[in-house]
């Protein structure tokens, strides 16, 4: 995974099982099957890393929706964390459901209770079903206006189908600064 202006690349390992036969007959090798060792997600927004348990909303803090981490944004732009598909942009544009090419389902939730803004201060650059490359601008939001309305901008990034995996590991220490595109979460 590259950091800075380069975007993360998901690691993929290929395996090939070969049938060993002690007889003189040759057995054909089984077909190669790609296996995903891990899925690396880039930070979808620039800011300060926070543990999911520190999000002041029990649904996220108690990992009811899944596992991940959060970012307190320093910039009002959200980017695709990997190559994949925009499954759903919520009508209020504060939440994005994203599915990576390998099937990890990611919720990027901009702020807490920002659904109540009904899309005010948010601008979507994609639509449901769009296939995008990592780093594609998904949503812009007016940080100052949202803060003035009294909303917390902490942005949980949650793997909602974490039960399909072992765990999600944040690659940055809590309170570390990240740029959009930096290595952020690894799903194993």
Region roles according to the model:
Residues 14-188:
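Contiguous, well-folded functional domains in the mature portion of proteins
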Residues 1-4, 8-11:
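Single conserved hydrophobic/aromatic residue that forms the stacking wall/gate
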